[in-house]
C-alpha cells in the first residue's frame, strides 16, 4: 500500500487545521481492512476479535521468530504466553510489527544482547517499548509498567531493568521509517499466507494475491510459465510433425497402391496388323498357294502404305508350333509347276519335303474372323502343313509387297 495514501485526504491534501477532530488518519480504514483480511483478524468488528490482540497465525510466526532470535533455553517463549500478554496488554498489530523491526535491528547491531536474554523477556520488553513509542502519554491505549508486569508475570523492578538494558542495546534509537513498517507488514503477510496454505493444503485467493506480490514468488512463477511455454511449443511441434508424417505416409502408400493397380502402358495393339502382314506365311495346299498369296495381298492393300512401312519392322515373325509328321503320299500336280512347264519330280522349290498333308485342316476364316474367300463353298479346301509354301511364292510375295507399299 502506498504510504502517501494514508497521510492525504480525499482531495490530496493534508492540513493540520482541526487535526484534533480526526479520530483516525485518512486511509486508516484501508489499512485496517488489509490487516484484517491478510493477517486473519476477522471481518466482523462486533463478534470477531478486534485489532487489540494478536491473531493465531500472527502469534505462531511471532513465537517462531523470537525463539530463533533468542535461543536461550531459560523461559522459552510459548504461544499461550503470547496470547495471554497480547490480550491483557491490548497489543495492536502495528505495535507487534514495530517490535519485530526492533528485534531485527538488534540482530545486526548487538547480537550479544540476544544471547543473554530469554525469548519471553524479549517479547515482553519489545512489545512494551513499541507500544510506548506509538502511544504517547495521555492516550487511551497507554499502559503503565505495572500493568505490563502484571500481564507478563514479572515484577516492576525487573521490568524496569529489562527496559533499560533493551534501550541501551538499541542505543536509544527507536525512530522507524514508515517504509520499514510496510516492509515488515508485507513480509508478515507472505509468511502467514504460506504457513496457512501449507497447513490447510490449499490456498485462498487472498493468499495467492499476497504470494504473487512477493518478488521471489514472481520470479518462480515467471520461470514456471517460461518452462510451460517451452514445453507447449515442443509438444505442438511434435504433434504437427507427427501429423505431417502420417499424412505423407498415407499419400505415399496411396500413390504406390494406385501405380501398382493401374495397368502399365505398352505398345499399341498390333495383333490385327501383324496378322494381316504375316498372313502370306500361313501354310496352304500346293494347288492353292498362289490363291492364298493373292487373297492376303488384297487384304493388306487396304492398309496405308505408311503404316505398313512403320509396323513391318516392329512385327516379330510368328513361329507356328510344329505339327506331327504326316505320312508320305504321292505327289499331285502343282498348278505352279504346270504354269512354268515343269514336271513335278523336278520341282524342288515347291516340293522340298516330298510330302503333303492329306488330312483336313481348320479353315483360316474361322481362326481370323474373316469371310470365306470361296464363293462357291463355305468350307475352304484343306491347307498344307507349315513350311510347305514354296520359296518362289515367298519371293513373289515380297516383290508384290514392295511394289504396293514402297519404302
From Swiss-Prot:
**Which molecular-function annotations from GO does this UniProt entry contain?**
protein kinase binding
Q: Does the keyword Cell wall biogenesis/degradation apply?
A: no
Please provide one cellular component term from the Gene Ontology annotations of this protein: membrane
Name where it's found.
Membrane
Q: Which InterPro entries match?
A: Cyclin_PHO80-like (IPR013922)
User: How does the entry describe its membrane topology?
Assistant: Single-pass membrane protein
Q: Which controlled-vocabulary keywords does the entry list? A: Membrane, Transmembrane, Transmembrane helix
CDD domains in the record: CYCLIN_ScPCL1-like
Q: What stretches pass through the bilayer? A: 233-253
Query: Superkingdom of the source?
Result: Eukaryota
Q: Which Gene3D superfamilies match?
A: Cyclin-like
Membership in a protein family: Belongs to the CNPPD1 family.
Instruction: Tell me what this protein is called.
Output: Protein CNPPD1
This chain is encoded by the gene named Cnppd1
